[in-house]
Amino acid sequence: KEFVKNILLNLKKNKSTFSPVFIIGCGRSGTTILGNTLSNHPKIKYLNERRDLWHRAYPEFDIWNENTQNPKLYADKKDAISKKNNLLRHLFFREQVLGNSIILLEKLPINNFRLEFLNASFPDAKYIYLTRNGLEVSKSIEKRIQKRNWFGGEKYELLKKYSSDNNILFKTKINSDKEKGMWEWKLSIEESNRFFRKENKGNFIHLSYQDFIDSPSKKIKDILDFLKLDYTENWINKTSENIKRKNPETKKTEDKSLYLIGGDILNKTIDNSYTPY
């Protein structure tokens, strides 16, 4: 299978330019619906949480497996190793070429903690940065924690280590599952906010989940214009017709600890005024 894929890659690759685009956003922020929507475009090859490709090149990034040697949640440019990068870029480019696509779109929420690594490994990359009201994200993560399918492997311990390594302190204890959800969201958005505030504005587009749900046609057009991809009005209407909220909006909570954990950036996402620009 690998052999056949590589033969096909060699036959087709001269007509292609590797164009990686990463969807960035904390888990439960709407990255799945955004990725699935964009994947309908015929010139986009979408990799939806293809951990298998990542872990072939960087096995240490598999934080969900308890048998991983020295697992890494956070990664920056010093973690980018050229031999491993060559394999990762090869695997991604092969997916793009075999998909007859001109954009390779990738989504893996843990990449929020690996933005400096992505920048070093894929200097030609572009980013679609999606943010969502932290109250809604923490509520969604809480449900996942309770189903016991969120903090698999070493993820929880590595988030704690990341927090202490960076001297990130909170004004309240973090005990409940909802508080843990808010804590992960806060760590994640602070990391992406820091990165995008200094990133070249031409390399990324930012949108909120709220705006995507309220004006899907406009937001999809904005993204495709940013990626320089063609579309028809008919395609836009068809692609955006089923985009809607699954759960009611959350604008406030009685749980004061969530505001203490989320801080000012939480309030900005609640009133939909957050921007990294």
Residue ranges and their predicted role:
Residues 1-21, 142, 149-151, 155-206, ...:
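PAPS-dependent sulfotransferases, especially Golgi type II membrane carbohydrate sulfotransferases
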Residues 41, 122, 199-201:
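Acidic-histidine catalytic/liganding microenvironments
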Residues 107, 118-144:
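Conserved phosphate-donor/acceptor-positioning beta-strand/loop module used by diverse small-molecule
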Residues 87-117:
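Glycine-rich phosphate-binding loop used to anchor ATP phosphates in small-molecule kinases
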Residues 44, 125, 202-204:
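Short, conserved active-site loop motifs that form the nucleotide-linked donor/cofactor pocket
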Residues 1-91, 98, 242-246:
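PAPS-dependent sulfotransferase catalytic core
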Residues 23-25, 104-107, 129-131, 206-208:
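Short beta-strand segments
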Residues 32-35, 53-56, 112-114, 135-140, ...:
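Short catalytic/ligand-binding loop motif for oxyanion handling, primarily in non-cytosolic enzymes
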